[in-house]
Each structure stands twice: as C-alpha cells, then as structure tokens.
Amino acid sequence: MTYSRKIKVGVVGVGHLGKFHVQQYHNINNVICMGVFDINSKEAHRVSEEYNIKAYGVFEDLVNECDAVSICTPTSTHYVVAKQALLSDCHILIEKPITDNIIKAEDLIKISNEYDKIIQVGHIERFNPALSELNLDNIKPTFIESHRLSPFNIRATDVDVVLDLMIHDIDILLNLVKSDINNIVASGVSALSNKIDMANARIEFTNGCVANLTASRISQKQLRKFRIFENNKYTNIDFLHHSQETYILDKHKPNKQSPHVIVSENQDKYIIYSKSKIKPYNALTLELNNFIDSILNQNKPLVSGYDGLAAIEVAFKILKQINLNNNK
C-alpha cells in the first residue's frame, strides 16, 4: 500500500544495532530518516556522513523533529530515553528488553496510552522466517525446549543472560502458550562477568504445557533452536539457519512411497518428515516495516509494549529463582 504521508524517524544509539536501523530505514519508502544521536559524537558523525543525515548534538532536538525513533541504547538507559521520546510526542521502537525494571516498563506503557503513541519492542525473532512459517492458531504445545547459545561478547554484559538472550525465547513461548504460568524452577551461574552468563529455566503452565529454556553467552559457537512437541507432532525451528523441520506421527499409510516416511517396526505407525522451503529475508526490515505500518494505520504492532512487559515479568521471576538458589 502506498501512503502520501512520510514518517520522520530518528535513531538513538548508533552502536552495533543502531547502525542497522539507520541502514534499513533508508530502504523503507514511507520514511524520512532525520538523523541520529549518540553520546559518542564521533561515531554519530561517522554514521551521519555515511548516510548523509544529521548527527544531533542534543537528544531533545532529535526527538522534537521526529514522528518516531528507534532506541538502540544500553538497556539501563531505555527508560529515560523512551520516556523523553514519548513525552516529545514520538512513537518508539525500543530494542529488547523493554527496560531493566518492571515498574519502568509499566510507566512507559501508561505514558504511551496517555499520548496515544505506539511502543514496539525489538523481539526480532518474531519476524524470523523460520517462525513466520508456523500456523500459530493450530499449535497446541505439550512440551517446548529451546537452546540459545552465543560466544562471549563484552558488549552485552550490562544485563544477565536471561534479559540478553533468553528473553527472545520467553517472548516466543508466551506467544505460543496461551496459559498462565503455574511454576518456575531455574538455575544459573556467572562465569566471565558479574552477571548471570548461563541459565536454565523450567516453566510449567496451568494448561499442562512445560517449557525448558537454556541460554548461554559463554559458548564456543552459536545455537538458536526452538523445539515444539505436540500430540503426534514435533517441530524443530532453527532461528540461526532459518529452517524448520516437522515430524508427524500418522497411522494412515501415505498414498505413495516417499523417502521422507519412516516406518515403525510393526508398520502400524508412520513418521512423516518434512522440511519447509523458507524464503530468506531480513527480519529487521520486516520489523521496521511493521513499526512504520502500525504508525500509518494506527494498528497494534506485532510485538507491543505489553508483550515486552510480559517477557520481562517472566524473566525477573526466573532471575529471582536463580538468585534464591545461588544464595542457599
């Protein structure tokens, strides 16, 4: 759909993620990228020169000239930056996690409602093509298992691994399992930082579904897998390689012989394997387009402020259990 109106956007924080936001905004038709702000003025000017946009020396000047901003600053600064942007009448896309504190997240949502502004939270895996292939309406998980492992990076150590990495899988989990949480058992350790670097959480839902989430930022290699078990069905999602495999248990023999059919010994059950052909695309482009479309159409974004709040509520429950175990 073509719109006559163009959204004036800015990017706050031009570190690792912020640079990608600037790059992708330049590819969206309904956007005018006004400029960037970063406390590192040298880096802000470097990005501004690369994309021929303005490097603002004062944060307030940027938000006062924009309709919307991406907030790509450290988590500890999210609340202050986002609040000022909302009060300056800006819609905001705020990188995950929404804040480092539940009360702060609730306050941002309250302000956004008062000013009729959109909050979108950057849980980018929701836009991963491997997840987008799923028909969420037909999924009834009984058990979910996720592993999200990453090599150590000093850049991400301002928060625990639960808020840094596991938060992605918490958000996806809450989107899949529409049920209250009954119990959480969790453990974690610090290894290379003064925060939790490795964590595991078992989450039990009132509808009987159980999830086991593992996250580590001290791995030798990356791994981002999410496994969904249903009655007679298993789905394996690889977020890193954008692939999805499905195994379905069926008592009906397929119409024709297939190399993707596994027959049990007594041949009364068939395991039918399939691997989706997923067309790759840039998830950030889709995320930013969703943000802009939400503004233009006044729609709820795919990942709202409420979704971001729900994710950190569970994350802090997990961290509470970890701290209780570590202090025994």
Put a short name on every predicted segment:
Residues 21, 51-109:
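Beta-loop-alpha module in the N-terminal Rossmann-like domain of NAD(P)-dependent dehydrogenases
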Residues 1-51, 173:
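N-terminal Rossmann-like dinucleotide-binding module
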Residues 53, 88-90, 115-118, 209:
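A short helix->loop->beta-strand "cap" motif at the edges of active sites that frequently abuts
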Residues 99-156:
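A contiguous active-site-proximal alpha/beta segment in oxidoreductase catalytic domains
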Residues 124, 232-302, 328:
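C-terminal glycine/acidic-rich active-site capping loop/insertion
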Residues 1-3, 68-71, 286-328:
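C-terminal helix-rich "cap/oligomerization" subdomain common to oxidoreductases
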Residues 170-245, 281-297:
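Contiguous beta-strand/loop segments that form the cofactor/metal-binding neighborhood of enzyme cores
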Residues 122-129, 152-183, 196-197, 308:
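Mid-domain beta-loop-alpha active-site segment that forms a flexible
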